[in-house]
């Protein structure tokens, strides 16, 4: 089949780079822009979607990004995303302004540029959930301000 004019806009098999905090038996997750921009796309984007099926601390240390990040925590039942069988602990802010938020429902979190955030700890997982992030940047690594948290 001949290449079409718009083929570059269809990214097939967008597998993500395995995060160092990932349990060894974790399923591969999907993601784009983790280590390199998507070839042929004009807008910068990094995105990850991964199943969470057991408790673990994904990101143990706080970090910042040079741009905003959107995190999402979604119930794993595709017929009822409101069914959220997990408890997630997520920290935003630093020092006396640090707040620990407990996520027990399908939730989106906007993290402004420069705001210290994490640890991210999946404390209880009774049923699988989906976790992901979106950033309008050419790569995830390009946005880290300071030392890498993982």
Report residues per predicted region.
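Double-stranded beta-helix
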Residues: 1-15, 120-150
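Short basic alpha-helical hairpin corresponding to helix-turn-helix/winged-helix-like nucleic-acid-binding
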Residues: 54-58, 63-75, 86-88
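Conserved metal-binding segment of the jelly-roll/cupin
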Residues: 100-123
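Short acidic (Asp/Glu) patches
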Residues: 53-57, 92-97, 113-117
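A short, N-terminal "cap"/entry segment at the start of jelly-roll beta-barrel domains
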Residues: 1-62
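A short beta-strand-loop-beta hairpin characteristic of the jelly-roll/cupin
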Residues: 73-104, 142-145
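Conserved hydrophobic/aromatic beta-strand scaffold that supports enzyme active sites
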Residues: 71, 108-110, 133
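Short, solvent-exposed aromatic-acidic interface loops
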Residues: 90-96, 110, 135-137
């Amino acid at each position: 089949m001949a290449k079409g004019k718009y083929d570059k806009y269809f990214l097939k098999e967008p597998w993500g780079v395995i995060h160092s905090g990932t349990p060894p038996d974790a399923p591969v997750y999907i993601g784009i822009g983790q280590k390199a921009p998507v070839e042929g796309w004009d807008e910068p984007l990094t995105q990850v979607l991964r199943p969470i099926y057991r408790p673990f601390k994904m990101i143990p240390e706080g970090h910042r990004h040079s741009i905003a990040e959107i995190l999402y925590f979604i119930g794993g039942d595709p017929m009822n995303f409101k069914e959220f069988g997990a408890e997630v602990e997520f920290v935003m802010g630093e020092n006396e302004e640090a707040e620990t938020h407990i996520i027990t429902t399908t939730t989106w979190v906007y993290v402004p540029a420069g705001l210290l955030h994490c640890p991210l700890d999946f404390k209880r997982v009774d049923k699988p959930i989906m976790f992901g992030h979106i950033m309008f940047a050419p790569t995830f690594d390009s946005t880290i301000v300071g030392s890498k948290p993982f």
